[in-house]
From Swiss-Prot:
Presence of keyword Methyltransferase: yes
E.C. code: 2.1.1.14
InterPro entries: Cbl-indep_Met_Synth_N (IPR013215), Cobalamin-indep_Met_synthase (IPR006276), Met_Synth_C/arc (IPR002629), UROD/MetE-like_sf (IPR038071)
Cited Pfam families: Meth_synt_1 (PF08267), Meth_synt_2 (PF01717)
Biological source species: Rhodopseudomonas palustris (strain ATCC BAA-98 / CGA009)
Chain sites annotated for binding 5-methyltetrahydropteroyltri-L-glutamate: 24-27, 140, 547-548, 593, 637
Protein name per Swiss-Prot or TrEMBL: 5-methyltetrahydropteroyltriglutamate--homocysteine methyltransferase
Cofactor annotation: Zn(2+)
Claim: Cytoplasm is one of the keywords in the record: no
Binding residue positions for L-homocysteine: 463-465, 516, 631
CDD domains named among the record's database cross-references: CIMS_C_terminal_like, CIMS_N_terminal_like
Cofactor remark from the record: Binds 1 zinc ion per subunit.
Gene3D superfamilies: 3.20.20.210
Catalytic residues as annotated in Swiss-Prot or TrEMBL: 726 (proton donor)
Length: 788
């Protein structure tokens, strides 16, 4: 490396930080407020304290460009909707300041009991009950595991400045001594993230009405002293057409004409600009942020084509994953750029907002010391950037210890036997195409399965989990603290399992499940029993609102030391003569809901998990299981943002599912479950998975999702969900028979199973009992109609 350094100090910027607090203080404050145990003033006081602490922590770690307005009580897209007055009429807002009651109604609906209205896999947002108003729709933020509230627009949509939150938080920071860079979601990405209730409305046609509101708030920020404003436009890493590219030129041209002295840092992340590069470089902006973790090579084109006075924000530290950076390697990459452009035109930054990583690694006292030395959470990433800045600003000697420690950690990780297991890599290398194929085609398998299982037409089952009552959660917590012995906890769980099985028999279900009372989370339960995974105590990240998740850390080669579910399956099957499904989480879902190692391709890590699940499937079959369900709730979530990359992902994702499910005899029935709202564009991949039975979420779409399967002539069996588990409302027999008749119009009777949309973990037993009794009766009536 050249010893030449620049004399001016290099700016260190963050694009956004975790809002939840090191100990999830925001979660506690929100849930206390929602439960009526604290006041609005109490909540706002906690929020202000969290913001102040966030700014102080960044300043202390050498961040010189500190964001404001990155904080949110629920979601930054919802904040933007409120800011621009995009509040649907149903919420009763008629102008003026937007109350917290209105804000949270948009976020959560106004049903009486909101707790636990999510999907049982814990990664969905719930709908409201029929009373009150529903929440806005929620969906994934690009390809992350964060969820945003989808803006709703109508044909007569108007916008107005309804909230000055960005201005308030800028002033709040200024009063504390921090001159921040306010951050707002950019107008084009905001519109693209929304949806219209009116068919045929092009959301981008609303841009001329929206931009003046942005100009108003940006003008007020400038008047208050803001020299720079960060506008997030991650839509620039998506596939865009010429009309969408023109929208960027129109919006930013208008902003620049109205506010010529305000410097805009346009931020892009989650990928490279690709064919949108020329569009971005032609915009009248003062700075451009690039994700150089996901798209490191784009810097060359930007330097070659971009204006020489454009400030480049280099996203060189991974804002989405928890691995420590190799700082000497980064120095080698960044130094030539700084020398070429000058320190005043370069900023060092994470690749994206640090919202997607936990707050502070120092809170983890129980991690393996080697593993801990390879990790970096939000605060540590700020420190890494600060070290990099000092090394590039002539202060190399002062940070030599940090640089050496970084290099040592990277070298140790590359060679560690904790990461690399030759037996695993040898086994993965020996996988053959035959291992990803069932012995026979579906038609031959189905004949054998039907002979063996002797199920009625329209067989009834559930997706896997039953209600996790307060008693179960208390027992789990007590066991975790050591207050209940392993033996006593096991006895308690066996009792719950036995009751659930007796209850299912009484209701009349054809295919039973054991209820999953022993499982805390559908990914964590397996990760804790597989080598290559580690778990944190305080590694929380925000999923949505007050919901936080603690993703497993997939740090090394994966194998299964011993069976994970066989004991529970054998116990459950011993209590009934009816078929008991084995219940597993699929490899793609385990991968997509974890912090994944970055030293091998994701496909390699997934293949290893698939081999471990394959072993479990084989042991369940050996123990006598006739049906094994392998859930792939997150298969679709892993799709790359660019459609050109879909095939590559789907090829290996489907191969991994087939690898874990194809080692069984023809007469063993493989089930899978998926909870998505869109199948048309991946139906080929779903068919290629070749599961004998797939259960899907269809009740809210009135079975329209099945059109994709009908058009495709999908041959295998399908369980379209006949009731929405997200609502506590018990659907009538008639509602479910109506849905089944709609399903029969699209698929043959022999293909259809009858089941709820998703697992029942988050519902109460009273709701579940009423709904499943009606579901079994609906199936009985449809059998009569079909036979008649």
């Amino acid at each position: 490396m050249s010893s030449h350094t620049v004399s001016t100090s290099l700016a260190v910027a963050t694009l956004g930080t975790p809002r939840i607090g090191p100990r999830r203080e925001l979660k506690s404050a929100l849930e206390s407020f929602w439960a009526g145990k604290s006041t609005e003033a109490d909540l706002l006081k906690v929020a202000a304290a969290l913001r102040a602490a966030n700014w102080a922590r960044q300043s202390a770690r050498g961040v010189s460009v500190i964001p404001s307005n990155d904080f949110s009580l629920y979601d930054q897209v919802l904040d933007t909707s409120v800011m621009v007055g995009a509040i649907p009429e149903i919420y009763g807002w008629r102008g003026g300041p937007v109350s917290l009651a209105t804000y949270f109604a948009m976020a959560r609906g106004t049903q009486a009991e909101i707790a636990g209205h999510g999907c049982a896999n814990g990664h969905h947002h719930g709908d409201s009950t029929p009373q009150g108003v529903p929440a806005q729709e929620m969906t994934k933020w690009f390809d992350t595991n964060y969820h945003y509230m989808v803006p709703e627009f109508s044909a007569g949509q108007s916008f107005q400045l309804a909230s000055v939150k960005p201005l308030e938080e800028y002033r709040e920071a200024k009063a504390l001594g921090y001159d921040t860079r306010p951050v707002l979601l950019g107008p084009v990405t905001y519109l693209k993230l929304g949806k219209s209730a009116d068919a045929g409305l092009d959301v981008l046609s609303l841009l001329p009405k929206l931009v003046p509101v942005y100009i108003e708030i940006l003008g007020r920020l400038a008047a208050a002293g803001a020299k720079w404003v960060q506008l997030d436009e991650p839509a620039l890493v998506l596939d865009l057409d010429d009309r969408e590219r023109l929208a960027f030129r129109d919006a930013y041209g208008q902003i620049a004409r109205e506010l010529p002295h305000l410097d805009i840092m346009l931020t892009t992340y989650f990928g490279g600009l690709g064919d949108n590069l020329d569009t971005a470089l032609a915009l009248p902006i003062a700075g451009l942020h690039l994700d150089l973790v996901r798209a490191p090579k784009q810097i060359n084109a930007v330097i070659a084509k971009g204006p020489k006075d454009l400030v480049l924000s280099l996203g060189v530290v991974d804002g989405r994953n928890i691995w420590r950076a190799d700082l000497p390697d980064l120095l080698d990459r960044v130094e030539p750029i700084v020398q070429q452009r000058g320190a005043e035109r370069v900023q060092l930054a994470p690749s994206c907002s640090l919202l997607h990583v936990p707050v502070d690694l120092e809170l983890e006292t129980g991690l393996d010391p080697d593993l801990k030395s390879w990790l970096s959470f939000s605060l540590q990433k700020m420190g890494e950037l600060s070290t990099l800045s000092r090394a590039l600003s002539g202060d190399r000697a002062a940070v030599q210890d940090q640089l050496s420690a970084s290099a040592k950690a990277a070298a140790t990780r590359r060679k560690s036997p904790k990461v690399h297991d030759m037996a695993v890599s040898s086994r993965a290398a020996a996988v053959t195409p035959a291992m990803t194929q069932r012995n026979s085609g579906f038609a031959a398998r189905a004949t054998l399965q039907h002979q063996r299982l002797q199920l009625p037409a329209f067989p009834t089952t559930t997706i896997g989990s039953f209600p996790q009552t307060a008693q179960i959660r208390q027992a789990r917590a007590a066991h975790a603290k050591g207050a209940i012995s392993d033996a006593d906890y096991n006895t308690f769980l066996r009792g719950e399992t036995a009751r659930a099985i007796q209850w299912q028999e009484k209701v009349g279900l054809d295919v039973l499940v054991h209820g999953e009372f022993e499982r805390n989370d559908m990914v964590q339960y397996f990760g804790e029993q597989l080598s290559g995974f580690a778990f944190t105590k305080e590694g929380w990240v925000q999923s949505y609102g007050s919901r936080c998740v603690r993703p497993p850390i997939l740090f090394g080669d994966v194998s299964r030391p011993k069976p994970m579910t066989v004991g529970w399956w054998k116990y459950a099957q011993s209590l009934t003569g009816r078929p008991m499904k084995g219940m597993l989480t699929g490899p793609v879902t385990i991968l997509n809901w974890s912090f994944v190692r970055d030293d091998v391709p994701r496909s390699t890590a997934c293949l290893q998990i698939a081999l471990a699940i394959r072993d479990e499937v084989g042991d369940l079959e050996q123990a006598g299981a006739t049906m094994i369900q392998i859930d792939e709730a997150a298969l679709r979530e892993g799709l790359p943002l660019r459609r050109s990359e879909w095939k590559g992902y789907l090829d290996w994702a489907v191969e991994c599912f087939r690898l874990c499910s194809s080692g069984v005899k023809d007469e063993t029935q493989i089930h899978t479950h998926m909870c998505y709202s869109e199948f048309n564009d991946i139906i080929d991949a779903i068919a290629a998975m070749d599961a004998d039975v797939i259960s899907i979420e269809t009740s809210r779409s009135k079975m329209e999702l099945l059109d994709a399967f009908k058009t495709y002539k999908y041959p295998n069996e399908i369980g379209p969900g006949v009731y929405d588990i997200h609502s506590p409302r018990v659907p009538s027999v008639e509602e479910m028979t109506t849905l089944l008749q709609l399903a029969r119009q699209r698929l043959s009777d022999g293909q259809l199973w009858v089941n709820p949309d998703c697992g029942l973990k988050t519902r109460g037993w009273d709701e579940v009992q009423g709904a499943l009794v009606n579901m079994v009766e609906a199936a009985r009536q449809i059998r009569q109609v079909s036979a008649g």
